[in-house]
Amino acid sequence: MGVSKKKSGEIRGDLIPGLPEELAIECLVRVPFQFHSSIKSVCRSWKCVISSRSFIKERIGFGKAESLLCLVQPLTSPPSPAMMEGGEMSQKKKEEEEGESQMTQQLLQPRITGTPLYGLSVYNATLDTWHRVAIPERIPLFCECVAIQDAGKVLLIGGWDPETLQPVRDVFVLDFFAGEGSGRRFRRGRPMSAARSFFACASVGSTKVYVAGGHDDQKNALRSAEVYDVEKDEWSMLPPMTEGRDECHGFSMATDPGFCVLSGYGTETQGQFRSDGEIYDPITNSWSTIENVWPFPDLSPRGRTAAAAAEFPGDFRGCRLWCFIDSERQSQPHWEVEDDSMKWKVIMDTIRLPVTTMTSVFAGSLSGQAVAMIGGGGEESGTMMVKTTAEKNGGKWSHVNTPSGFSSLPFSCSSIYV
């Protein structure tokens, strides 16, 4: 088993008296995430096991991990105690009260007229519940949300200052596998070297997050890129991209540690999305170009593309993406493109959304399923829908119960198992 007595001799005696360690682990992995805070206090051995990084792998292996979708979205109303309490987001009572009080004060503080307050919402797809994370300070508008599964962390990066509406360098780290409290801890990370918003962002490997492009405080499209090591809390600069790319979208290149920046537009061509992308190779420390990968000059890839579940053998070097399109838009159902180095490939499959072109949508992926939050004035407005894509016929869209406090269209999202 992955969790054992090997960890510096911290675990002594039986985890559960009278049971072999393997059976004891099988019992512990079945405890819902919301109770991990409580069972960590039972004994040192249990705390050591549940706080270890290998414990989540055991939960995934036994099919007991809970799938969370984290969304950065405008707050439509002050969070009620019901939204802040219970489930996997619960804390000790004192922490709950402090978090609620701080968030309420944030909502009451004066801001620029018309500027929404953003929050981090969490949908537990396993339990079909919604919660909002109590964060001790305001998070930036339009910040990027990215998860690093192996590290058990969700990061909020960049965006706009809610007071000045200027791009920021901020990094916030939410640790779901923290050793104390509810099993999550919130802190500030080291800021980026450059302030940016509307940029490409993706986790690559077990500890790294790459960012590239976006725009600065003068709305200039950026070529710059950098990488964050979440364990070392350090940023390192990368070579700049060939082109400045605002409103671009980022992806990990699946089996290899590459980083793909999809589409975007230049300073002088705002709103005209490029058909190409760029891929960073950490082995050569260089960028290559991939042509004809985004065929929609009038459509941003943000909220319309997501990483699909891997279905390719180990020799596949690149990424497979879902492209979410309106029911009325013309498009190929599938296309494949290689970069100019002939090393990387991007495979794109289209998924038809249950909406028309007049509806606002933010789409992504969650546990191998397509997921879409629907906005605008359509019939399905304010709801989330999921589609099981593994079925031969492509599956059907189905509704997710979405409380009114969580119905606003998100800006970014990421998913993580706990």
Curated annotation (Swiss-Prot):
Keyword Nucleus: yes
InterPro entries (UniProt xref): F-box-like_dom_sf, F-box_dom, Kelch-typ_b-propeller, Kelch_1, KMD1-4
Key word Membrane present: no
Kelch repeats (start-end): 104-150, 153-206, 208-255, 258-314
UniProt free text on domains: The F-box is necessary for the interaction with ASK proteins.
Subunit note: Part of a SCF (ASK-cullin-F-box) protein ligase complex. Interacts with SKP1A/ASK1 and SPK1B/ASK2.
Pathway terms, separated by semicolons: Protein modification; protein ubiquitination
Record-given protein name: F-box/kelch-repeat protein SKIP20
Stretch list, region Disordered: 79-104
Location (main, coarse): nucleus
GO biological process, one term: regulation of phenylpropanoid metabolic process
